[in-house]
């Protein structure tokens, strides 16, 4: 059984970690999200979430980030060994958790096929 927590070792936390996606990251666009992927060697997947002010106010942005974190916690097996940044696009604020899960599960299914 996989752990259902989200420890610091699995998070992208600092600005330089997010800036690495500007150089040579693979991109996958969905209707409401952009998934940036940087393959790495070593152990563990690290995930970060970016929601800009274009999406909504602080309450809305934090709500989206909570739902994205919960998606990661529940679906760790979908994620490949890489640094991943999930960027919410404008319009992501109207999605409920089920819609987010469906859209991102399909996206990560495509990524697993491409990089497996």
UniProtKB/Swiss-Prot annotation:
MF term (GO), any: tRNA binding
Catalytic activity, EC: 3.1.26.5
A GO cellular-component term linked to this record: ribonuclease P complex
A UniProt-annotated Pfam family: Ribonuclease_P
InterPro entries according to UniProt: Ribosomal_Su5_D2-typ_SF (IPR020568), Ribsml_uS5_D2-typ_fold_subgr (IPR014721), RNase_P (IPR000100)
Family: Belongs to the RnpA family.
Description of how the protein assembles with itself and partners: Consists of a catalytic RNA component (M1 or rnpB) and a protein subunit.
Its biological purpose: RNaseP catalyzes the removal of the 5'-leader sequence from pre-tRNA to produce the mature 5'-terminus. It can also cleave other RNA substrates such as 4.5S RNA. The protein component plays an auxiliary but essential role in vivo by binding to the 5'-leader sequence and broadening the substrate specificity of the ribozyme.
Protein name as catalogued: Ribonuclease P protein component
Organism in which the protein naturally occurs: Geobacter sp. (strain M21)
């Amino acid at each position: 059984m996989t752990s259902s927590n989200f420890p610091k070792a699995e998070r992208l936390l600092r600005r330089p970690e997010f800036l690495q996606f500007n150089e040579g990251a693979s991109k996958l666009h969905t209707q409401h999200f952009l998934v940036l992927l940087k393959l790495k060697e070593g152990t563990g997947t690290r995930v970060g979430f970016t929601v800009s002010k274009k999406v909504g106010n602080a309450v809305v942005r934090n709500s989206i980030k909570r739902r994205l974190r919960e998606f990661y916690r529940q679906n760790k097996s979908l994620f490949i060994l890489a640094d991943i940044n999930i960027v919410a696009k404008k319009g992501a604020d109207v999605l409920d958790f089920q819609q987010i899960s469906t859209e991102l599960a399909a996206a990560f299914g495509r990524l697993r096929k491409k990089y497996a």
